[in-house]
Amino acid sequence: MTKFTGAWTEEEVESYLRDAAIPIRLACHRPDESLWMVALWYRYRNGTFECSTWAEADVVRYLRNDSEIAFEVSSNHPPYRGVRGNGSTSLAEDEGKAVLRDLLERYLGGTDSELARWLLSEDREEVRIRVNPRRVYSWDYTDRMQGVATGE
């Protein structure tokens, strides 16, 4: 069961995560127990984040070794707001690259680009990373940053 705290209700968090087309930052442990951070495209539904990445990516190896993570999805321009938390991950084949295709639609507006064609090529195997949050904390500095120009 996910615990939601902070500035927003669970419904407001879910709305933000569905609408914000910015990467999720995942922090995990490397096998030597040092920390590693990676930014990935995500989709949020049914209380979980789903990402897709190359099966040979370092983060896949790290998550196979230790599934515990911390995460953040936040704006880079004022007014600053977002969510952070922790949880665990599970890995599976991204069958038919379904998650990747959805992410290409979400972040690039479709699959008609050189990047999309490369990511969808037959010789690339993709892994779905599912993030199961335990704790989600939201913050929103909109009120305190009134009058600050936005960069978005």
Model-derived features: positions:
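A short, polar/charged loop/turn motif at coil->beta-strand junctions and beta-hairpin connectors
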Residues: 16-20, 79, 125
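Charged, gly/pro-rich active-site loop segments
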Residues: 1-8, 81-152
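Short, basic/aromatic recognition patches
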Residues: 1-25
